[in-house]
Amino acid sequence: TDISNVDDNNILLNVDEGALNNLSFGYGLSYDTRKTGLNASGGVLLRFDQDFSGLAGDIDATRTAVLALAEKTILNDSISLRIIGEGGIYDRTNGNSRLTERFFARGKLRGFESNGIGPRDKNVLKDALGGNYFASVRMETDFPVGLPEEYGITGGAFYDMGSVWGLDKTIGAGSDNIVDDSFNLRSAAGVSLFWSTPIGPLRFNWSRAFEKQSYDRVQNFD
């Protein structure tokens, strides 16, 4: 991995700058009853992934990620209910974790930008730093909105919560730029519009963040 062209004002990312060699291997386990289970109105998905670095190269670390999903339809399959939980741990044993190795909240928390939560440098650019840990829970429902079925338009609602946290280094040498890397819960809720079109399904989300930090970057529509 190579981190380059880092702004001089970003002391924490300057520490990460440079190239490292890495050789890793991993495995994944999954259990999915959504298509094959006896209960046609619901199912679960369980997934466990783990990667190991250290056989060769400059990085000695373990990356673990888990996902659990449960879904069910009710009222003659007209309404669907779904809950998704995710979590991850990155444990590096030979030095500090780097930007390219950490977790970010991309796609895991609606109501915020892709890198909108988690530890953030306090410099001019306010760069997202990622975290060694992440956890999220997303709850959502899909339902008809009263339009004819041929329109292909349905509605939804959701509530998300989670966090990205944990750095091995929270301050650069000789700097008072201390980063908040503690666990701070974020949450957001909103509504969705689903539209089945000839070019594929479209989804529009309107959301509002309820729990957030002053340095987070929210996103009310996507």
Regions found by a protein language model. Give the residues of each.
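C-terminal outer-membrane beta-barrel translocator/porin domains of Gram-negative envelope proteins
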Residues: 2-153, 157-177, 211, 215-218
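Outer-membrane beta-barrel "beta-signal"
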Residues: 26, 191-200, 219-222
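Strand-loop-strand
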Residues: 173-177, 182-197
